[in-house]
């Protein structure tokens, strides 16, 4: 075969023109050491704090320590395949997670990857996990309620949309139960929920997900799970990932509720990461910025005004405020609320629900200590009917606890004191509530009205809860119009109050209590 010289030159030219000679300029470094999910990397001269790094095997890490001659990075996920001498690349990006309604009903890990075996999540948007909280001008005061469906909380420690309310107590006092009941009660109320499980057993998280599915709550809930078997870095970042998913709804004029269960384990994970990065330890071996760890997370829970939402959505959503309500959980050791992390979170939040082991063991569940549980802003958000009726309950309980302690030493009591003690016993019994059975507003209103107006005084303490259930059934079947009016208006007019009194008296005549 004979080739023409001109053809050869044309062939060479066409081959040369087809070559891609674009050089990719990337900042690279070398792994010096890898221990317990922490990598020391030499090089990476242009790396930024919090930047994502690309390791071999499609693994990513986060640059946390920027030192003179090396970078300390945490590996997100498996790190066993990374070895000394491997090449690490800068990505120029910070950590992002998928956000949007596509995540509802799913269980994801810290990076937003599905772990429930239901296939991929086709989220159209992603967002950074570390964001600056809305400023003072962008916020609006808390004025709408988040109904938890728990009598003792809605009556005495009300929570508003955009509030941060701490749930604090020893292990096995029902902290998760309060949070899960609150999520179940949001059904049909237009509140999206995010449940962040940090450092819990996988079996415990699976049980929570099963309960949410049974009550139809997974339709509006995202579960972010960083189990005890996940790395410390994944546990520390899970709360921020969940917060970003919740902010998606807040910034678009929707209402969201996020539960961090629990921030004690997040602080432990952060302490572990910090000590492995050789940061100097402080009180209780926590690093110096452990307060900032929680404050920058909880400040992102807020109620934002209409202007903020309109500006964020470029005018697509107008006339709507958005909110993200946070229920952080803190586990105490032997009731010690003066430890480092509990005091930090108490000072950051807008109130706390304190759960006590003694009350829990005495069968008073939810085991809420009414004396030291407070809500600093929720009173403004309480529904009118509950606000009218709940004033007496807290006073009754406080006086009852005081008198009960005093009555142990007194042999003869006057009638007024005895009456006060009897009323207190009945109110304490009335505030007991089984798990996964949240109440609607009208049910709570009927129970409080009956307690305040002496309808329970002649009922045996052991019959209080059956009496309450019977009363609710009676109202629902025979006085449906009254029930609907209270539920719709969230108020109790004089006519409705008279009708409610007549309905309770009607029930008293027919019931065998």
UniProtKB/Swiss-Prot annotation:
InterPro entries: ATP_synth_asu-like_sf, ATP_synth_asu_C, ATP_synth_asu_C_sf, ATP_synth_F1_a_nt-bd_dom, ATP_synth_F1_asu, ATPase_a/bsu_AS, ATPase_F1/V1/A1_a/bsu_N, ATPase_F1/V1/A1_a/bsu_N_sf
Keywords tagged on the record: ATP synthesis, ATP-binding, Cell inner membrane, Cell membrane, CF(1), Hydrogen ion transport, Ion transport, Membrane, Nucleotide-binding, Translocase, Transport
Keyword Nucleotide-binding appears in the UniProt entry: yes
Cellular component, GO annotation: plasma membrane; proton-transporting ATP synthase complex
Pfam families referenced in this protein's UniProt entry, alphabetically: ATP-synt_ab, ATP-synt_ab_C, ATP-synt_ab_N
Protein's membrane topology: Peripheral membrane protein
Residue stretches in coiled coil: none
Binding site for ATP: 169-176
Site (Required for activity): 373
GO terms of molecular function: ADP binding; ATP binding; proton-transporting ATP synthase activity, rotational mechanism
Catalytic class of the enzyme: translocase
Family matches, as NCBIfam families: atpA, PRK13343.1
HAMAP family, alphabetized: ATP_synth_alpha_bact (MF_01346)
Function as written in the Swiss-Prot or TrEMBL entry: Produces ATP from ADP in the presence of a proton gradient across the membrane. The alpha chain is a regulatory subunit.
Assembly and binders: F-type ATPases have 2 components, CF(1) - the catalytic core - and CF(0) - the membrane proton channel. CF(1) has five subunits: alpha(3), beta(3), gamma(1), delta(1), epsilon(1). CF(0) has three main subunits: a(1), b(2) and c(9-12). The alpha and beta chains form an alternating ring which encloses part of the gamma chain. CF(1) is attached to CF(0) by a central stalk formed by the gamma and epsilon chains, while a peripheral stalk is formed by the delta and b chains.
Record's protein name: ATP synthase subunit alpha
Encoding gene, per UniProt annotation: atpA
């Amino acid at each position: 075969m004979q080739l023409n010289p001109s053809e050869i030159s044309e062939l060479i030219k066409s081959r040369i023109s087809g070559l891609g000679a674009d050089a990719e300029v990337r900042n690279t470094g070398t792994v010096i050491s890898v221990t317990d999910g922490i990598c020391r990397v030499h090089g990476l001269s242009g790396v930024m704090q919090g930047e994502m790094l690309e390791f071999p095997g499609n693994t990513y890490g986060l640059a946390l320590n920027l030192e003179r001659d090396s970078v300390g990075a945490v590996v997100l996920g498996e790190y066993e395949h990374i070895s000394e001498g491997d090449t690490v690349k800068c990505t120029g990006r910070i950590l992002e997670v998928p956000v949007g309604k596509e995540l509802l009903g799913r269980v994801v890990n810290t990076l937003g990857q599905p772990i429930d075996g239901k296939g991929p999540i086709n989220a159209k948007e992603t967002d950074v996990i570390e964001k600056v909280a809305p400023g003072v001008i962008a916020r609006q005061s808390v004025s709408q309620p988040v109904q938890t469906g728990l009598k003792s909380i809605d009556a005495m420690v009300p929570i508003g949309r955009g509030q941060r309310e701490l749930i604090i107590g020893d292990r096995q006092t029902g902290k998760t139960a309060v949070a899960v009941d609150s999520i179940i009660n949001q059904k049909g109320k237009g509140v999206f929920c995010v449940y962040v499980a940090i450092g819990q057993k996988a079996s415990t998280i699976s049980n929570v997900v099963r309960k949410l599915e049974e009550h139809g709550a997974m339709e509006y809930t995202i579960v972010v799970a960083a189990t005890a078997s996940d790395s410390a870095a994944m546990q520390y970042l899970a709360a921020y990932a969940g917060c970003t998913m919740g902010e998606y709804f807040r910034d678009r004029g929707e209402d969201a509720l996020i539960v961090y269960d629990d921030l004690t384990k997040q602080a432990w994970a952060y302490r572990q990461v910090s000590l492995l990065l050789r940061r100097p330890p402080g009180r209780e071996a926590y690093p110096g910025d452990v307060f900032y760890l929680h404050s920058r997370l909880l400040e992102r829970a807020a109620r934002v005004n209409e202007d903020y939402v309109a500006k964020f959505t470029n005018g697509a959503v107008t006339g709507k405020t958005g909110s993200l309500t946070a229920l952080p959980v803190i586990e105490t050791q032997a009731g010690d609320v003066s430890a480092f992390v509990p005091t930090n979170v108490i000072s950051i939040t807008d109130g706390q629900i304190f759960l006590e082991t003694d009350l829990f063991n005495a069968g008073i569940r939810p085991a809420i200590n009414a004396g030291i549980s407070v809500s600093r802003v929720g009173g403004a958000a309480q529904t009118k009917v509950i606000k009218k009726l709940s004033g007496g309950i807290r006073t009754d309980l406080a006086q009852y606890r005081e008198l009960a302690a005093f009555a142990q030493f007194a042999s003869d009591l006057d009638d007024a004191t005895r009456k006060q003690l009897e009323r207190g016993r009945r109110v304490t019994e009335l505030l007991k509530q089984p798990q996964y059975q949240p109440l609607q507003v009208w049910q709570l209103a009927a129970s409080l009205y009956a307690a305040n107006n002496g309808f329970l005084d002649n009922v045996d303490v052991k019959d209080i809860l059956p009496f309450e259930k019977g009363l609710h059934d009676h109202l629902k079947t025979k006085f449906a119009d009254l029930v609907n009016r209270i539920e719709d208006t969230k108020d109790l007019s004089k006519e409705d109050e008279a009708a409610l009194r007549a309905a309770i008296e009607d029930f008293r005549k027919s019931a065998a209590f």
